[in-house]
């Protein structure tokens, strides 16, 4: 339903950006964009006007999904520099549609993710449908994900680890993802205890923070 709604606003092959933090609606958009043959441009929700203008302009995004009025105000500052941007939509407020879905080429672009830009402007990394899903499958196999595993995802969705390796890896192994809006070590341990998490993932600084939080407020993670 969401994919069909997207096709009332965009044409298959067009880039569509998502500028928002983690949430179930983000994942819905990820899958719907793939089904609709759109290229999802993932945007760091911490971006300010100039960074946002660079990513939206460079990718040629035809639309952007966002959540807050504050984001809309930031976008207004650079909107006149983005001639290809037609639509500004609220994430979760899906357009209605009932048309057919296209046949999507596995070699076509699925997502455009941007690097951190530590030595200059963020650079685009284009991921195909086949590459994205195979990478997630191989990563899941490498860490030993199994059917029934539960993981509280601490990684941001604008990063390939969050939206690709973990999200798609769990889907392919019939696991369960608990969505964490943003990394909070105490909250992550609380949810891991509540939902009986079987796997913990994250970058080293996150794991260090989790160990410190567990010392302050121990949880039953058995």
Question: Where are the model-predicted features located?
Answer:
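Conserved helix-loop-beta element of the AMP-binding
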Residues: 60-63, 80-89, 150-152, 198-202, ...
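Structural core segment of the AMP-binding/adenylate-forming
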Residues: 4-9, 35-94, 100-102
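Conserved S/T- and glycine-rich ATP-binding loop of Class I adenylate-forming
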Residues: 16, 33, 64, 109, ...
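Conserved pre-ATP/AMP-binding loop-to-beta segment of ANL
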Residues: 97-114, 120-121, 144-150
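Conserved AMP-binding A3 loop
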Residues: 110-137
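Short secondary-structure boundary segments
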Residues: 67-69, 182, 204-205
């Amino acid at each position: 339903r969401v994919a069909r709604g997207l096709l009332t606003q965009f044409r298959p092959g067009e880039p569509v950006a998502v500028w928002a933090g983690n949430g179930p609606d983000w994942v819905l958009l990820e899958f719907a964009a793939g089904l609709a043959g759109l290229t999802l441009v993932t945007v760091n929700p911490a971006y300010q006007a100039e960074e946002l203008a660079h990513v939206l302009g460079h990718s040629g995004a035809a639309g952007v999904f966002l959540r807050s009025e504050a984001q809309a105000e930031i976008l207004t500052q650079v909107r006149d520099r983005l001639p290809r941007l037609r639509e500004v939509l609220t994430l979760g407020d899906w357009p209605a549609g009932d048309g057919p879905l296209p046949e999507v080429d596995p070699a076509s672009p699925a997502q455009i993710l941007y690097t951190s830009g530590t030595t200059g402007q963020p650079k685009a990394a284009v991921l195909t449908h086949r590459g994205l899903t195979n990478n997630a499958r191989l990563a899941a196999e490498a860490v030993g994900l199994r059917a029934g595993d539960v993981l509280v995802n601490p990684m941001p969705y604008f990063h390939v680890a969050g939206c690709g390796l973990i999200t798609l890896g769990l889907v392919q192994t019939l696991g369960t993802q608990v969505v964490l809006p943003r990394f909070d070590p105490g909250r992550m341990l609380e949810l891991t205890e509540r939902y009986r998490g079987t796997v913990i993932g994250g970058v080293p600084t996150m794991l260090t923070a989790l160990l410190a939080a567990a010392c302050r407020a121990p949880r039953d993670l058995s």
